[in-house]
Amino acid sequence: MKNKILVKNNELTVDISAFDDKDEVLSLQRKNFNLILGKDSFLRGFDANLIGQKSLPLYEFSMVIPSDFKDEKLRGKTLDFKVHNKAKIKVNSETNLDKEKIKSLEKELANQKEKNALLLLDNVKLKSEKEKIIKDFKDEIKTFENRAREKIAEKLNLEKQLLENKFEDFKKYGSQKIFESIMPIIQNLLVAIE
């Protein structure tokens, strides 16, 4: 156990004691507890107090109990912990990466970075194409609106001209009818005057 540093996925068998001031918190007491570092299987944030420490038979630290802890009385309290390491560290295979696996992962990471760069480039191209399509569509709408306005203006001018012509015809016809209706009266007056 000497000179080993605790890392994620190390497996420890521990006894855990928790204290609120000097009073032991029995609900957090564990005996022969199998603790896989990084999983936070005992308490959220607990493992972070052990990861990076040298392998020792006893660890002592304080931590604040998470605000979503099941026991409402303990939420937000700072408790003192004693963790007795009872067995040798089991090193899970995930922590023993050999050089070939590291190279493979580095290559995979490089490939993924290249794919991400290509996807980013494609996204930029797609965005540019999308912007061009939107601009072209807006231009077509403006052209259509202008043509529609011209057609409407032509139609209105034609209708206006037709109405003006009808009005002139009506004025001529109306004047003629009025003249025809008063003509007998004028003739009678002329006859009466003579």
From Swiss-Prot:
Domain of life: Bacteria
Leader sequence residues: none
Location in the cell: Cytoplasm
Keyword Cytoplasm: yes
SUPFAM superfamilies in alphabetical order: Coiled-coil domain of nucleotide exchange factor GrpE (SSF58014), FKBP-like (SSF54534)
GO terms for MF: peptidyl-prolyl cis-trans isomerase activity
Any single GO CC term annotated in Swiss-Prot or TrEMBL for this entry: cytoplasm
Keywords: Chaperone, Cytoplasm, Stress response
Binding partners and assembly: Homodimer.
Family according to the record: Belongs to the GrpE family.
Function: Participates actively in the response to hyperosmotic and heat shock by preventing the aggregation of stress-denatured proteins, in association with DnaK and GrpE. It is the nucleotide exchange factor for DnaK and may function as a thermosensor. Unfolded proteins bind initially to DnaJ; upon interaction with the DnaJ-bound protein, DnaK hydrolyzes its bound ATP, resulting in the formation of a stable complex. GrpE releases ADP from DnaK; ATP binding to DnaK triggers the release of the substrate protein, thus completing the reaction cycle.
Protein's recorded name: Protein GrpE
Name of the gene: grpE
